[in-house]
């Protein structure tokens, strides 16, 4: 047993210090990034925000809606090959270039993903997603995927420490997904005691990944556009959002009605709700590590997307970053004990 004495920080523990700026307007800020990925060699340009691969967020409808904002969607792994074919038949190449194909690590997952990728060459992203990215089996699967799809851009996770981030990049991942336990409907930290404050995880993993020419996506922990800005400020190349994009018309959650008011169910992918839906229930050897919440319907996702992008542009103007790429270089975090004046929050 050992104890690390260094303080680890989440988004709630810091604010970004403002700096002098020559920008005249938020409209002067360029949010689009251009990347060339280490292993695939593929180039991509767009706004580096990703809708999470949850079946109540990462839907085909979400992908179509967010593509118009140049935002990516990691489509959840529970669609059939036939459903993928129908989506591809009704989608433009511009939409498909904003789509990630999600997969688990079983042999069946691998074969299904292979079939999906064969449907259309415009599908360039694979998102290999497990709750615990520290297993040797997972590392071996990433290497297997890289060998099978040498020109596809592979995103793999989740991990929270630099050495495992390096391991995944060396095994073939272009982008490493960072985050264990910070999600709004994730209960891993309270069920297992395992986790890592998200901002510190992002800072440490970004440093490790960038040293090898890889990239990271901060996955989880964002509750406001300001948190998205902090993730980019901490060095994230991409930011993945779940709860912030849940509850919309495109989110795909089941709608329930209580006392005449409609709500949409949103649940973690290791929750009892998810396991009942996809694998018949919670196995006797494990515990559910997610919860289910009822969200008031939030309308079309375009309004939320505009709010997030607007907040991000504003953050850049406060520190004098004319491009999103510059935000991390212009960011100085200050530790704080409060984030906002909450006097009217309950009204």
UniProtKB/Swiss-Prot annotation:
Which residues take part in binding K(+)? Answer: 181, 183
| Any GO molecular function | metal ion binding
Q: Does the keyword NADP apply?
A: yes
Query: What's its top-level EC category?
Result: oxidoreductase
- In Pfam terms, one family for this protein is IMPDH
Q: Which residues form the active site?
A: 186 (thioimidate intermediate)
User: From what superkingdom does this record's organism come?
Assistant: Bacteria
Q: Which InterPro entries match?
A: Aldolase_TIM, GMP_reductase, GMPR, IMP_DH/GMP_Rdtase_CS, IMP_DH_GMPRt
UniProt-listed Gene3D superfamilies: Aldolase class I
Which keywords does the record carry? Metal-binding, NADP, Oxidoreductase, Potassium
Catalytically driven reaction(s): IMP + NH4(+) + NADP(+) = GMP + NADPH + 2 H(+)
**What are its E.C. numbers?**
1.7.1.7
**Residues the entry annotates as binding NADP(+):** 108-131, 216-239
User: Can you list the GO cellular component terms from the UniProt entry?
Assistant: cytosol; GMP reductase complex
Which biological process annotations from GO are given for this protein? purine nucleotide metabolic process
| Assigned protein family | Belongs to the IMPDH/GMPR family. GuaC type 1 subfamily.
What this chain does, per the entry, is described as:
Catalyzes the irreversible NADPH-dependent deamination of GMP to IMP. It functions in the conversion of nucleobase, nucleoside and nucleotide derivatives of G to A nucleotides, and in maintaining the intracellular balance of A and G nucleotides.
Q: How does it assemble?
A: Homotetramer.
The name under which this protein is listed is GMP reductase
């Amino acid at each position: 047993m050992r104890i690390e004495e260094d303080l680890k920080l989440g988004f709630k523990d810091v604010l970004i210090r403002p700096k002098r700026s020559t920008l005249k307007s938020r409209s002067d800020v360029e949010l689009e990034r251009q990347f060339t990925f280490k292993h695939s060699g593929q180039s991509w340009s767009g706004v580096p925000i990703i809708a999470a691969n949850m079946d109540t967020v990462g839907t085909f409808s979400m992908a179509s809606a967010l593509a118009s904002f140049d935002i990516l969607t990691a489509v959840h792994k529970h669609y059939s090959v036939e459903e993928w074919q129908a989506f591809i038949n009704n989608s433009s190449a511009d939409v498909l270039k904003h789509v990630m194909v999600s997969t688990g690590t079983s042999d069946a997952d691998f074969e299904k993903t292979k079939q999906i990728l064969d449907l259309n060459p415009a599908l360039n992203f694979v998102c290999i997603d497990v709750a615990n990215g520290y297993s040797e089996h997972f590392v071996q699967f990433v290497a297997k995927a890289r060998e099978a799809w040498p020109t596809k851009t592979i995103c793999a996770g989740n991990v929270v420490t630099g050495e495992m981030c390096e391991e995944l990049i060396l095994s073939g991942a272009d982008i490493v997904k960072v985050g264990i336990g910070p999600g709004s409907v994730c209960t891993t930290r309270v069920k297992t005691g395992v986790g890592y404050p998200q901002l510190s995880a992002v800072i440490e993993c970004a440093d490790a990944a960038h040293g090898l020419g890889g990239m990271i996506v901060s996955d989880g922990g964002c509750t406001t556009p300001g948190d998205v800005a902090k993730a980019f400020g901490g060095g994230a190349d991409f930011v993945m959002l779940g709860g912030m994009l849940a509850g919309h018309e495109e989110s795909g959650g089941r709608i329930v009605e209580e006392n005449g008011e409609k709500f949409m169910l949103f649940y973690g992918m290791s929750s009892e709700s998810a396991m009942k839906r996809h694998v018949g229930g919670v196995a006797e050897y494990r515990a559910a590590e997610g919860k289910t919440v009822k969200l008031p319907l939030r309308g079309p996702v375009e309004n939320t997307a505009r709010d997030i992008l607007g907040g991000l542009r504003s953050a850049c103007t406060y520190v004098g970053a004319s491009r999103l790429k510059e935000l991390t270089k212009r960011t100085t975090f200050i530790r704080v004990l409060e984030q906002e004046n909450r006097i009217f929050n309950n009204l």
